[in-house]
Amino acid sequence: MSSKHIAAVVMALAIGSVAPASAQTPADDSARRAAELAAERDKKAEELAPSKPSLVERALHWYDSNGAKLQWRAFRFAMGGFTGGAGLGYGVAIAEQGMGSPVVDPDQPNRIDGEFLAARTIRGYQRIAAKMHVLNLGGLPVDVSVRWQDDQLMQEDFYGFGPGSTEAGRSNYRLDSSEYGADFTWRPASPFTIGGELSYLTPLIGEGTDTRYPTTQSIYDVEDVPGLSDLPSFVRTGASLAFDWRDSDSHPRRGGYYRVAAAQTSGVNDASYDFRRLDIAAQQIVPLGNRYRRLNLQAAAALTDSSGVNDVPFFYQPSLGGLRTLRGFSESRFRDRHAAWARAEYQWEAWWALDAAFFVDAGQVASRLSEFTLHDVEVTYGVGFRMHANERVVAGLDIAVSREGVVPILGFRYGF
């Protein structure tokens, strides 16, 4: 085949291969491009569309929006606010805000709020309480309230006094008490509050109902445990000063809280149990880069003092142990005239509704201030998990370790 024939064949093949491409018009290119852009827009819209909240998310949102109250009209479920050793509580509360007013206004002068509670626990503890508040008295930043509370605490623990008390000394007693009181709170400036109280108390000690342990009366002498019998009624007067700049009192992520309170408790027609008490507490939240990681630092001390030969009733003496102080020990594990404790927690948001924490607690009790020594400091440590809504903690599980073993503490932040 000649070179001319070869050139003709190559040219024909080239023209044939180009012909289909040249057959695509500009209109076809525009339509194809428009379809591709539409598909990309649909895909992006699907990615940006909000996901449907889960059942847990909807429940926690409801918990936040409804003030953490299982409520129907003025009635709501309540757990009673008992101490950690009381067991699971259940009951009903009636709360009415702005009584006689069609609108609940937090700034309304002389606004009247009322509350009533009746609760019980699975261990037989009982509580009945009523409160009446008058807010913004006379249009001033002053609140006053009157209250009444009747308690039957059936299985309170007592291990003896001092840091040397042992688990073998565990006993239980019953504390029945009625309290009538009046309080006032003055808010001179936004973070500051100044408070005062006047209370009348009628405590009565009996034998505990926890059959797992002996009663306090059966293994301790009345002479060695002040207040175990022959108690008078008491009058308590007190004053407090607090500074609170936390962003939330139930689930703080930044800020601090500092409080000092002093009280005088005097027996009615019997001065043998008169005493004074000073309480100091501080909390500081330190954000670590953002609101999802933080340090929660706390410290507190409770100091009592009596004149002459007077004794402080044992059940009014400060104690350590349980969820609020030393989590690696049982409730009220250590008791004496003075107590101090501190805590550090590293908290982070493991999930939007779940915080996790590593913590260390340390504390000590002593009969005299001079007896506070590092040698007697008790230390516990562990890990905790707290289910929460945006502003409120719902429940928590802390697993704490101490020299007496591992203590799991399940707590619900709910109630009156």
Model regions and ranges:
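Extracytoplasmic gating/loop element in the C-terminal half of outer-membrane beta-barrel translocons
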Residues: 287-362, 367
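Outer-membrane beta-barrel translocator domains and adjoining extracellular loop/strand segments
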Residues: 127-132, 156-164, 206-215, 252-254, ...
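Sequence/structural signature of outer-membrane beta-barrel proteins
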Residues: 97-101, 119-125, 137, 151-155, ...
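Residues on the lipid-exposed face of transmembrane beta-strands in outer-membrane beta-barrel proteins
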Residues: 92-96, 130-134, 182-186, 198, ...
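Outer-membrane beta-barrel translocator/channel fold
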Residues: 144-186, 300-320, 395-399, 404-414
